Design a protein with these regions (language model features):
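A charge-rich, low-complexity, intrinsically flexible signal that marks solvent-exposed coils, linkers
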Residues: 2-73
Length: 73
């Protein structure tokens, strides 16, 4: 059974978002959209109301690192 993700799994979520939305620049995504993308991920089991700006920033930065790796490769 795959690991269930929560808001604290920024690295894993960043990888999944990079795979799910490879065409998007994470730094151009609004936090409202990022929140929706995260809660729609398969395996995400976190409480949608438990997110905050710090958790979304951490996810955005993890996604951005994956995005940079893909675009620079």
């Amino acid at each position: 059974m795959p690991k269930q993700l929560t808001w604290d799994d920024a690295e894993d979520i960043g990888i999944l978002l990079s795979e799910t939305h490879p065409q998007l620049d994470p730094l151009a995504v609004r936090f409202t959209d990022l929140h929706r993308y995260v809660t729609e991920l398969p395996g995400f089991a976190g409480d949608p109301k438990a997110s905050n700006e710090g958790k979304l920033e951490a996810i955005q930065m993890a996604w951005h690192e994956e995005f940079q790796d893909r675009t620079q490769a």
